[in-house]
């Protein structure tokens, strides 16, 4: 009876935290949505060499990768709530620097701003793990899915902020959009201040197994590779798409709307992704997400109309949702409670490091190789990730007693 009450109370806290983090994700998730919508376009205006147009977006991803380990160390010392409050302040500062770069037409300053915004993103990306920290095993996948659902609102808030503010500063187009981004980060402070996370002392009591031992687990390897392929390819194609659309004669508005539909597709399925995982398993959902990513590339290779771009971007978003949430859920099975901080940080460093590399390479590739080349590059990594996850699924079903 007492055990039942404990589990019930634990999931009550987990649900409360998941809802708070969903709101924080809605505000913090607008941070990359705004930079992805505008980064390449502003980069084209400010960079002397158009090959570097996507560098601001790439630096956003690099900032996320660079920030995950310091963010984890900070949260280990201050707790989740303290770390997230500092992260939101960093986000507001980065947006202000980016706006200053636009106003002064200083490409380097603008890039610095997007990098700092990436540091904020490293905190935001850990919201999904924070939601799982207090959840029972039965509720973990759904808690992660709830938080990712906040990105659905971010997919509206970010692009709509651009539409509402882009013309407020005619002498410095889009500067007001980045100031709005900073205001959203400040609003996130009010939300994350309500978070009740486990005491840091509970994490410090036992450091668990060495990180190398954990990372050598075949399941961890398959999970991380699936996550970095799902996220890396999404960033790779998404960063190239607006540039390719404009190069094909489509309008900036059509490109921005394509990104909005893409972001909505990224987070919209979170209404039911947790239930899909309960029904079909973590590996099954991850495999479905990777297959949708490959299908997006097939559509991208089929034509250059607005419809082709939009459908490809929607499929890409759906694939990211299923693939990344499924892979994240798999990662949570690879560590003990006392190991979570270091394993989550290692996972995110690997994932967002690959995303940064993908984003850096996409600008030059779409400029010199074209949109078709970008899409052909999708298939090899998807095949590798599919093989690894499918093998793990086969192993689990073949030896259920060992699980």
Where are these regions (language model features)?
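Juxtamembrane intracellular "pre-TM" segments in multi-pass secondary transporters
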Residues: 2-15, 196-225
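Hydrophobic core of transmembrane alpha-helices in multi-pass small-molecule transporters
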Residues: 26, 107-122, 308-322
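Intracellular juxtamembrane helix-capping segments at the cytosolic ends
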Residues: 39, 121-135, 322-335
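Helix-to-loop junctions at the C-terminal end of transmembrane segments
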Residues: 67-80, 269-282, 366
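A membrane-interface helix-boundary motif in multi-pass transporters
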Residues: 81-82, 164-183, 364-382
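C-terminal ends and interior cores of transmembrane alpha-helices
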Residues: 89-104, 292-304
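Cytoplasmic helix-loop-helix junction between adjacent transmembrane helices
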Residues: 111-149
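C-terminal membrane-cytosol helix-exit motif in multi-pass small-molecule transporters
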Residues: 162-163, 182-202, 388-393
């Amino acid at each position: 009876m007492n055990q039942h009450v404990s589990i019930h109370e634990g999931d009550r806290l987990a649900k409360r935290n998941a809802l708070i983090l969903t709101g924080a994700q809605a505000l913090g998730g607008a941070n990359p949505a705004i930079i992805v919508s505008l980064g390449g376009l502003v980069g084209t205006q400010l960079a002397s060499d158009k090959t570097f147009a996507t560098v601001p977006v790439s630096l956003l991803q690099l900032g996320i990768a660079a920030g995950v380990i310091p963010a984890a160390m900070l949260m280990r010392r201050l707790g989740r709530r303290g770390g997230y409050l500092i992260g939101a302040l960093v986000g507001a500062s980065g947006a202000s620097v980016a706006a200053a770069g636009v106003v002064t037409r200083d490409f380097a300053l603008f890039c610095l701003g997007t990098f700092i915004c990436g540091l904020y993103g490293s905190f935001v990306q850990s919201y999904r793990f924070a939601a799982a920290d207090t959840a029972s095993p039965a509720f973990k996948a759904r808690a992660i899915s709830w938080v990712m659902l906040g990105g659905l609102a971010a997919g509206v808030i970010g692009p709509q902020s651009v539409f509402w503010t882009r013309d407020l500063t005619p002498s410095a187009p889009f500067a007001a959009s980045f100031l709005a981004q900073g205001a959203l980060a400040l609003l996130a402070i009010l939300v994350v201040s309500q978070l009740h996370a486990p005491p840091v002392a509970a994490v410090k009591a036992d450091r668990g197994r060495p990180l190398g031992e954990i990372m050598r687990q075949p399941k961890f390897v398959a999970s991380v590779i699936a996550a970095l392929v799902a996220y890396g390819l999404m960033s790779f194609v998404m960063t190239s798409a607006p540039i390719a659309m404009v190069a094909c004669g489509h309008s900036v508005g059509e490109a921005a709307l394509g990104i909005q539909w893409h972001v909505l597709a990224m987070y919209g399925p979170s209404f039911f992704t947790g239930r899909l995982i309960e029904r079909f398993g973590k590996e099954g959902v991850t495999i479905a997400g990777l297959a949708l990513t490959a299908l997006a590339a097939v559509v991208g290779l089929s034509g250059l109309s607005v419809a082709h771009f939009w459908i490809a971007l929607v499929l890409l978003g759906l694939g990211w949702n299923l693939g990344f949430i499924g892979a994240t859920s798999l990662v949570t099975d690879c560590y003990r409670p006392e190991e979570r901080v270091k394993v989550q940080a290692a996972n995110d460093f690997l994932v967002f490091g690959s995303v940064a590399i993908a984003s850096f390479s996409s600008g030059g590739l779409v400029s010199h190789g074209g949109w078709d080349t970008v899409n052909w590059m999708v298939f090899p990594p998807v095949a590798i990730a599919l093989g690894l996850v499918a093998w793990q699924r086969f192993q689990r079903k073949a030896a259920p007693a060992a699980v």
